[in-house]
Amino acid sequence: MLCHRIAKGFMGHADSRDMLEIEIKAPCKDLVKLEKNLVKLGARDFGTLVQADVYYAHPARDFGKTDEALRVRTENDLTVITYKGPKLDQDSKTREELEVSVANVGTISSILERLGFRPVLKVAKRRKVYGLRGVSVCLDRVDGLGDYVEFEYEGEELEAGKAIIKRLMGDLGVEGNERRSYLELILAQGRN
């Protein structure tokens, strides 16, 4: 969600409270080539972020079974806590996301732990953000996983949003679709 929030301020999106955030992610073999293709198509560069995400386990239910997540993300001076609901379809990573900025990562972590939540895993990544055709394109280098590209579009209609993203993916030569989160991918590596 943060990727899209950075870019949407520059792309003229209205208030997004009733909008869906439609996401499709794919592995990327060559981030440099993809970045060059984005620039050729006229994408706007919104900069590079270094993100550290800590995912938490609920004290009374298994988020793995309910397809939910609770994440505390830190980047630069910003800390955001995000609840992610179950995925809404079989093709994308689209899900309800509720988030709020917090002033202090240490305080929010202590609050969660005192409530019985426990940290499960930390995911660190370097994210380069572009905007093109109303889509946020995030080029991610994830520690321990490799390179991915994530497309995010905000709109009222799921199918229309997926079509916009898939058209852009085709124009960029991006294939594949990884519905699992970075957390799920890292946890799966540990099971193999």
How should these model regions be labeled?
Residues 16-134, 171-192:
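N-terminal strand-loop-strand beta-hairpin
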Residues 84, 142-148:
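Residues forming anionic-ligand binding surfaces in small-molecule and nucleic-acid pockets
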Residues 137-139:
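Short beta-strand/turn micro-motifs at beta-sheet edges
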Residues 159-176:
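Long, well-ordered alpha-helical scaffolding segments within enzyme catalytic domains
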